[in-house]
Amino acid sequence: MKKCYEFVKKYKSKYPLTLAFRLKKHCEIVDKHLNPGEEIIYAFVAQKNNDSFDIVNTNVVALTNKRLIIGTKRILWGYFLVSITPDLFNDLTVSKGMLWGKVQIDTVKENVILSNIDPNSLPEIETNITEYMMEEKKKYKEREEDE
């Protein structure tokens, strides 16, 4: 089983324009919350905010075989973790600005905005998240129909 940091390191070397800091600490949070049998399929980093000039909200976004996890380690103590299961996923919006890209993940309960992303990575992020979520949503619908 690959650790989150290996995926993030690969992403950062491939897309160096993404603004991100303290990656190992953020990855530790994601790794800590992986459930038994859960494996990371894809991971990337971004700032979790709507403002391109706010660069202190680095989050690690990990797509696992069961859900999407967004985690960040706070500077002094504590951390934040958001878990998005396929049944709560609604929509994904990708936008490219002059310097960076932005990904908006719309869920039943909230709208998660990820910014300061290398624009060259946007197609890869969109493809990985959308294809996985749509495939999993089909499974949820099949289960509901069987019941």
Predicted region positions:
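The phosphoinositide-binding surface of pleckstrin homology
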Residues: 38-53
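Conserved beta-hairpin
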Residues: 49-78
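Acidic, Ser/Thr- and proline-rich intrinsically disordered linker/docking segments
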Residues: 1-34, 53-54, 77-147
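Soluble periplasmic/extracytoplasmic beta-strand elements of cell-envelope proteins
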Residues: 41-43, 62-63, 69, 104
